[in-house]
Structures are given as structure tokens and as C-alpha cells.
Amino acid sequence: MNPDLRKERASATFNPELITHILDGSPENTRRRREIENLILNDPDFQHEDYNFLTRSQRYEVAVKKSATMVKKMREYGISDPEEIMWFKKLYLANFVEPVGLNYSMFIPTLLNQGTTAQQEKWMRPSQELQIIGTYAQTEMGHGTHLRGLETTATYDPKTQEFILNSPTVTSIKWWPGGLGKTSNHAIVLAQLITQGECYGLHAFVVPIREIGTHKPLPGITVGDIGPKFGYEEMDNGYLKMDNYRIPRENMLMKYAQVKPDGTYVKPLSNKLTYGTMVFVRSFLVGNAAQSLSKACTIAIRYSAVRRQSEIKQSEPEPQILDFQTQQYKLFPLLATAYAFHFVGRYMKETYLRINESIGQGDLSELPELHALTAGLKAFTTWTANAGIEECRMACGGHGYSHSSGIPNIYVTFTPACTFEGENTVMMLQTARFLMKIYDQVRSGKLVGGMVSYLNDLPSQRIQPQQVAVWPTMVDINSLEGLTEAYKLRAARLVEIAAKNLQTHVSHRKSKEVAWNLTSVDLVRASEAHCHYVVVKVFSDKLPKIQDKAVQAVLRNLCLLYSLYGISQKGGDFLEGSIITGAQLSQVNARILELLTLIRPNAVALVDAFDFKDMTLGSVLGRYDGNVYENLFEWAKKSPLNKTEVHESYHKHLKPLQSKL
């Protein structure tokens, strides 16, 4: 054990195990998660290849092998609970992306959300056992987030009771679905439904694409891999082109919308019900943002405690770089953000499950807010985490650029989350559309609930966006209640500014669509402020529920840092709205520096509480034992370029050149 890390852990003011229990949901969850992890670590069949030294084809093969072995092992161990499956995958796959992942994360959830009982009986078991390997084919070469623009067609033929699927243009070719290129034999395809001469918009169809047994593409199907990408090298993101490809009528998922044998269309109770899979995945991505940022913080903070560099006082030993205030200012707000996102991720998961249960009973009242909140928080958390992961890499100096640090892989694996499952700016605008509807309802005298209830204060003119918001007392920068109120006022103010600017453009005889575009920057700002308020509120609401006083104190410091750092970064919004004064902003910045000092003794213990195994981190710099330099040298020796003392290229190219000089 590195002596600096040993000292760091000894200096902590709390027991990290107690925070681990909170993050896992309970001590029992922690016990069970570790039990599952130990099954993997003690299994002789488990092998962990260093993906950094593999070709793309090798990475894909290893990932497929891992996926197949993982399914067999989960059956062997009797692991079927969704949360336990997630724990198993995280350690078993380590830092590999799973080619069969969309079978479990999108194909099966879509069957559950949109399939009839008969359809679930037909396809669920085979897909759970990987007889059917499914993917989710929505995105096309020419359209992604703009679902109404998708061009793939499914035309119903009542004579044969079949749908005829076509990719009518080059831009209509399905493009990007994970596992589509080489792995999947089925896809849930989103296509424009045409029956009796009318187009009824996007619907989901279960489409066999490869023959089971031979795995060859079926007639009418053209399918393959889209090529190398920024990351995800072991994932076979693919393309799919369909030419007059016929599937039975029963392959349309018909839990909500239906097509009768004669071609009659029966519309769903709500069009938004078909977006269930997207909402599910977006709610999951919030938690994934927390996980990825937590990994990067763990690596950067542990390494910063081990790395010694430069000097603070002359003639004294080189200090740990974690002692530099600038390093703390880079990393501790990100650590606070990781914790904030953990809590909001759990909140979103619980909210999704609760509302989904209500939807199953026919209550759709909370669906619009769920759709808006998952879209906005998906964008807010992934943007923030993406930038934070890169900040952690740079905080590791030159070694952070090496794949040995683990952070480059975390970054390239996470960064597509900013554009898949909904491009983030478009997601923010979807949230804004909901906020504008709520704003109109409030202005007409209706009281609203949920996370937008703060807009109920608008008619009383307590918030005056173009002038001064009435602030009854000075903001107490040590009061989480007061800081939450400040974020609430900022959100309300920016929502009202966007709404009034939108109305101004409409009153100038602009169409609603043109007015929306001309207001879109304000609308995104309003959505961002709303999401920021939700995160602050969820984090601060969590603290009173924590029993242990030492744990509560350290998490309170993180919550204060998260809230104050956000005010510092968005100071213009708070100043323009007269929510805080210039003098208070100076106090905020001073208090942030005080909090860095308070958090410093607990920094390593706070990342230890995430309880990542070294295998999951995949980092030489972030090792639990802190023995960085010895292992960095050993890691470098594994490079394929080191297999020979003299590379063959020397004899082929350099030696002939040198002999002529």
C-alpha cells in the first residue's frame, strides 16, 4: 500500500462503508453486490484481457465471448434480479462494451412496455436466453432525434396480413444501432406505419434479420458494421437496409396501437406511450452519468494523493498535488457533482418505476412530466459528466493521456451519451416545451404539482424577470434550504423570460415554429436552470434522511459545494435576477475555497466509498493500493511494439535509407 494513500484513509472523519450502503440503497444491497463480485473474482473461467493491446476485431470477439460466458454464468448462479444483473455485468465486462447489451437494455424493455401478453410469451424467453439476440433500430442515416422525420416504411398488405418494410432512400437506412452489425438476429424497427392508404406515424415492429442457426442475413435484408468510431471499438454498431421485406401482422407491437386483419387502425390511448423505451433508457443514463464521473474522480483523486510534484515551500519535500488549491478546485466540485448525480439517478429510477406502474393502471397524468424530466436530466447530467471526465483526465497531467490511466476509455465510452437516445440540445428543447405548457397553465390560473410547482408563484409577481425578484432576506450561503430557493427563483425567472420572449416573437406575426427557433437559446437556458434546480433539491432533500452524523456532515459539505459552485459558474443569472448581490457572490466564492479545505481530508475516503474494484476502473493511476509507478512500467512492457528489440520496419524502410546517406 502506498504510504500516502494509507495516511489519507486514516485521516478520514467518517466511515466510507456507511456511504457505500447509502449509494447501494442499503447494507444488504452492498453485501449482495459484493457477494456477486466475489463469485466473479473467484471463478477460474473469468479472464480479463487488457483491451488496450487488442485490435478492433479481437476486441469484438473478446466482448462477444464475455457476453456469452456472462449469460451462462448468470444462469449457473441463479442471478435474475435486474439490479443484480447490472452488478454482475459491471464487474464481469469490466471496461468492455457489450455487443448483446441492447438486447437487455432496449429490446426486452420494449417488448415489456409495448408488446401484448401473447407477444411477450412468444419473444421474451428466447431473448432472455439469447436464442433471439435483439437490438433497437430507430436511428437512420438521415434522421436521429427527430423521430417524425424517420423514413423507413411498414406498409400493411391485408391480402397476406403482412407488413412490407422498405428503406426507400439512402438516408432511410438504419444507422448506429449497437449489436446490429454482426451480433443481432432480430431488431425492433421503428417505421412509419401505412395502412389503407394513410400514414399513422412511427410504430415498433419485431423484425427477424438473420437466420437462426446460420446467422446469415435473410433475403431482403442488407446488414453490416458501420466502421471504426471515436470509441466503442468492441461494439458492432450497424446499418440495416430493407427491400420489400415482409413480416407477419403479429410482428407489430400492439399493446397500445393495433392494426386489425382487414387493415383498420386502432389508435393508442396516448401517442407518448410508444416512447416508453426511450424514457426508460434516458432515466438509466442519469445513473450512468454518475457512475462514469465517479470512476474518473476516483482515478484522478487517488492519483493526486500519490503524485508529488513541484513545491509549495522551498527546501521541503515535494507536496502531493492534491494539496494544491487549484487541483482541489478542479476535482472537488466534480466529486460533489458525482454524488449529486448518484442521488438524482436513484430518484429518477424510483420515479420512473412509480409512474410506469401508474401508466399500467391507465393513469397517464404524470407521463408528460416524466418524459420532460428524463429528457432534460439526461442532457444536463451527460453534458456535465462528459466535461467532468475530461477535466479529470487533464488533472492527471501527461499520464492522463495514456490509456493506462483508464480515463480515455471512460471518456470515449461515455461521450456518445450526449448524442444517443436524443441529442442533448433537442432534449433540452423537449423539456422547454413542457415548461412552456406549464407556464401557460399557471398564467391561466391552474395550480401545478411535481417539480414544476415553483411556477405557481408566478401570478403573484413575486418573480419579476425583467426587473427585480423580491427576495425577502439575504441568501444564507450555509443554508441548503436558502440555496435551493435561490435555484428555484433562477429557474422560474428564466422560464418566464423564455415564455415572454417566445410570445413577443409570436405577437410580431412570426409563426409558432419560427418563434420557437428564435427563442431556442433562452429555452435551453430555462431547461438547464430547471434541471439544475431539480438536482440541488434532490441532493439537499437526501441529507435529513441520513442517520450517521459524520456521514451527514461530509455529504452536507459536498452538497454545499455543489450548490455554491453552480452559483459561482452561473453568477450572471443570479445577479441579473437580483437573487444575490455582487457582495454575496464574493462570499460564495470565498466559501467555496473554505469548503475545499474542509473536504480535503476526506477526499480519498469519499472516492473509496464508490467501492470500485480495480478491475472495473481499468486504471494504473487509480489503483486502490496506489502503487502507480511500478505498475505503469509493467503496463508499458506489454505493448506489442516491445515484442522485438528491433521492429521489422527498421530493416524495411530506415536501414535502406541510412545506407544511402
UniProtKB/Swiss-Prot annotation:
Phosphoserine occurs at 26, 649
Q: Which InterPro entries match?
A: ACO, ACOX_C_alpha1, Acyl-CoA_ox_N, Acyl-CoA_Oxase/DH_mid-dom, Acyl-CoA_Oxase/DH_mid-dom_sf, Acyl-CoA_oxidase, Acyl-CoA_oxidase_C, AcylCo_DH-like_C
| Cofactor dependency | FAD
Q: List the catalytic residues.
A: 421
GO annotations under biological process?
alpha-linolenic acid metabolic process; fatty acid beta-oxidation using acyl-CoA oxidase; fatty acid catabolic process; fatty acid derivative biosynthetic process; fatty acid oxidation; generation of precursor metabolites and energy; hydrogen peroxide biosynthetic process; lipid metabolic process
Q: Which domain of life is it from?
A: Eukaryota
Question: Is the Acetylation keyword given for this protein?
Answer: yes
Q: Name where it's found.
A: Peroxisome
User: What does the tissue specificity note say?
Assistant: Expressed in Schwann cells. Expressed (at protein level) in liver.
Q: Which residues carry this modification: N6-succinyllysine?
A: 89-90, 159, 241, 349, 437, 446, 512, 542, 637, 643, 655
Question: Could you tell me which residues carry N6-acetyllysine?
Answer: 65, 216, 255, 267, 272, 437, 446, 500, 512, 637, 652
This protein's UniProt keywords: Acetylation, FAD, Fatty acid metabolism, Flavoprotein, Lipid metabolism, Oxidoreductase, Peroxisome, Phosphoprotein
- A GO term, aspect molecular function: acyl-CoA oxidase activity
Q: Could you tell me which pathway this protein works in?
A: Lipid metabolism; peroxisomal fatty acid beta-oxidation
GO cellular component terms, alphabetically, are:
cytoplasm; peroxisomal matrix; peroxisomal membrane; peroxisome
Main enzyme class = oxidoreductase
What the protein does comes down to: Involved in the initial and rate-limiting step of peroxisomal beta-oxidation of straight-chain saturated and unsaturated very-long-chain fatty acids. Catalyzes the desaturation of fatty acyl-CoAs such as palmitoyl-CoA (hexadecanoyl-CoA) to 2-trans-enoyl-CoAs ((2E)-enoyl-CoAs) such as (2E)-hexadecenoyl-CoA, and donates electrons directly to molecular oxygen (O(2)), thereby producing hydrogen peroxide (H(2)O(2)).
Q: Which family does it belong to?
A: Belongs to the acyl-CoA oxidase family.
Q: What is this protein called?
A: Peroxisomal acyl-coenzyme A oxidase 1
